């Protein structure tokens, strides 16, 4: 049987940290994409083409990671809600 030692409030606090992490990852990717455009305007040749191909290959993986962090946020929020609801259900069964 699972044992959760965190309160719903603590789970929600953790969930917010995952959202913040997702936003930070997205912001970094956006900044690097802008920087990539600056480099692109000033660097021609096959070396840059290889560099750009690598960047373009990795960018979607970073976007997927940001989405994963958002998904974890949603899962933690659901768990917090379930814990609260279960606690309320048990309390109502006991009291009456």
From Swiss-Prot:
Gene3D superfamilies found in the cross-reference section: ESAT-6-like
InterPro entries, A to Z: ESAT-6-like_sf (IPR036689), T7SS_ESAT-6-like (IPR010310)
Pfam families the UniProt entry points to: WXG100
Family: Belongs to the WXG100 family. sagEsxA-like subfamily.
Subunit structure: Homodimer.
Protein name: ESAT-6-like protein SAG1039
High-level lineage: Bacteria, Bacillati, Bacillota, Bacilli, Lactobacillales
């Amino acid at each position: 049987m699972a044992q959760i030692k965190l309160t719903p409030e603590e789970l929600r606090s953790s969930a917010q940290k995952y959202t913040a992490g997702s936003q930070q990852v997205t912001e970094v990717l956006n900044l690097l994409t802008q920087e990539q455009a600056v480099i692109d305007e000033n660097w021609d040749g096959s070396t840059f083409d290889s560099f750009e191909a690598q960047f373009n290959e990795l960018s979607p993986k970073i976007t997927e990671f940001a989405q994963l962090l958002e998904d974890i946020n949603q899962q933690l929020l659901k768990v917090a809600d379930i814990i609260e609801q279960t606690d309320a259900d048990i309390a109502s069964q006991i009291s009456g």
